A protein has these predicted regions:
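Conserved ATP-binding module of the ATP-grasp superfamily
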Residues: 134-136, 160-163, 175-214, 218, ...
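ATP-dependent carboxylate/phosphate-activation module, predominantly the ATP-grasp catalytic core
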Residues: 205, 211-277, 281, 299-321, ...
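A short glycine-rich, hydrophobically flanked beta-strand micro-motif that places a catalytic Asp/Glu
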Residues: 277-290, 431-435
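A glycine-rich beta-turn/hairpin centered on an aromatic-Pro dipeptide
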Residues: 333-370
Length: 440
């Protein structure tokens, strides 16, 4: 056997346990990233909505280990039998479980305390503040029955503010602006029915100087950490969010002055240190304010849409890097990769009032544009839309590349000129009902 063949066999023999969630990155993208690196061992729990339907596909793309209903000891035993060389999840709600399993299996991953900081917004903000990282003011929202704690919150909190779910919240789900303590109580009372807990954050004012008209004043820094060494791969720019805080568009590379870029990278690096992160791919959100940059949040996973944009702009394969890190490889970049074009991803959202889509027109014309590489209809006629879903409730997404930021601004205008979204509100059409009867 040749040395080359031996190397291929060594790579192919590696096994990565991936705790799967159907609302994370696609099976095809993950399998493609693993193709020359390792065999995937899909760890599945069919109590997670959408998982059972994916089992036939997962079985074609690796080994499936079903841990539904198993306790910790049985789960560890089932996974150990597969002899994994690494472990990974790309979903916040599975982060703490993955950390606990990694510790039992002696595999590299975030430790349990770091995983808690990634999935508990209050704990994360405490760690960032205590580490000297500039963050918005924040306050823990108590349970409704704790009258003394509510009096304290009323005395300490400032308004307007932003109310967010405290645990495992992704994509601006159920995130709202509140103007008073009464609005906070009302929202918490509604969420309490589902056992939801919340955190209240200072509403950060906008900084308009240094920001092109049409772009937002917040960015994200895409980083990796390998054995404690941080490499920063890109700064992702944003378009202004749809109400109340739903993402509408992202692009790599952000249009920033050199001074602002340095500030963003420094804030992201400080956040990584404050949380004690030693491994993984990270997504750090930063807002520029009149008083300087503030770290909004640090995610212990890859941001949605980032792998595609980073690849289109630089050629770097971020999902493959995440797998390599999980397998224990050392991956370090001396400097951020150079961008050749501007890569974008738009989430086109329904108006805040809309509850059911009745018509989407113009997608075929938009898809024919040479700047478009992918267009996906997420909510079609007859389907429900709900702003509470945050980013995930968008009507359609469109991704691709353009030559520069001027072309990006022009393309964003074209999307809204070309595509028409029609719908109804106030439950005029029940979810799954016939949109033809909307005007009846």
């Amino acid at each position: 056997m040749s040395a080359g063949a031996q190397a291929v066999d060594a790579v192919a023999s590696r096994r990565l346990a991936l705790l799967y969630h159907p609302h994370s990155f696609s099976v095809f993208a993950l399998a493609g990233a693993a193709r020359t690196l390792c065999e995937l061992v899909w760890i599945v729990d069919t109590t997670i909505d959408g998982t059972e339907a994916m089992l036939p596909m997962l079985e074609r793309m690796g080994t499936v280990v079903d841990v539904t209903g198993l306790d910790q000891e049985a789960t560890v035993a089932a996974m150990a039998a597969q002899r994994p060389d690494g472990i990974l999840t790309l979903k916040d709600s599975l982060m703490q479980r993955t950390a606990a399993l990694a510790e039992r299996l002696a595999l590299p991953f975030h430790d349990s305390e770091v995983a808690r900081r990634f999935t508990d917004k209050h704990l994360q903000r405490v760690a960032l503040r205590d580490g000297g990282v500039p963050v918005p003011g924040f306050w823990e929202v108590p349970e409704l029955a704790d009258a003394a704690a509510w009096e304290s919150l009323h005395a300490l909190a400032s308004f307007p503010a932003v109310l967010k779910p405290r645990y495992n919240s992704e994509g601006s789900r159920d995130t709202i602006r509140v103007e008073s303590i009464e609005q906070v109580r009302a929202a918490v009372g509604f969420g309490a029915e589902a056992g939801e807990r919340f955190v209240l954050e200072e509403y950060l004012g906008d900084r308009r100087d240094g920001v092109r008209a049409g772009f937002a004043d917040y960015v994200s820094v895409e980083s990796i950490v390998s054995n404690g060494e941080v490499s920063q791969l890109a700064v992702t720019g944003r378009f202004p969010p749809a109400e109340p805080f739903r993402e509408s568009g992202f692009f790599i590379d952000a249009e920033l002055s050199e001074a602002d870029r340095r500030r963003a990278l420094a804030a992201a690096r400080a956040a990584v240190a404050a949380l004690g992160v030693r491994i993984g791919a990270l997504h750090t959100e930063i807002k520029f304010t009149p008083d300087g940059p503030r770290v909004i949040e640090l995610n212990g996973r890859i941001g949605g849409g980032v792998p595609e944009m980073l690849h289109d702009a630089t050629g770097v394969e971020l999902l493959a890097i995440a797998l390599r890190l999980a397998l224990g490889e050392s991956v370090v970049f001396a400097a951020p990769p150079v961008t050749s074009r501007v890569a974008y991803l738009f989430y086109v959202q329904a108006p805040l009032w809309m509850t059911t889509v009745t018509r989407v027109d113009g997608l075929d014309r938009l898809a024919a544009d040479p700047a478009v590489s992918e267009l996906t209809l997420n909510r079609g006629p007859g389907q429900c839309v709900d702003w509470r879903e945050g980013n995930h409730g968008h009507v359609f997404s469109v991704g691709g590349t353009v030559a520069d930021h001027d072309a990006l601004i022009a393309f964003e205008r074209r999307i809204h000129d070309e595509v028409t979204i029609e719908g109804v509100g106030d439950d005029a059409v029940p979810c799954g009902g016939d949109p033809a009867h909307a005007a009846a």
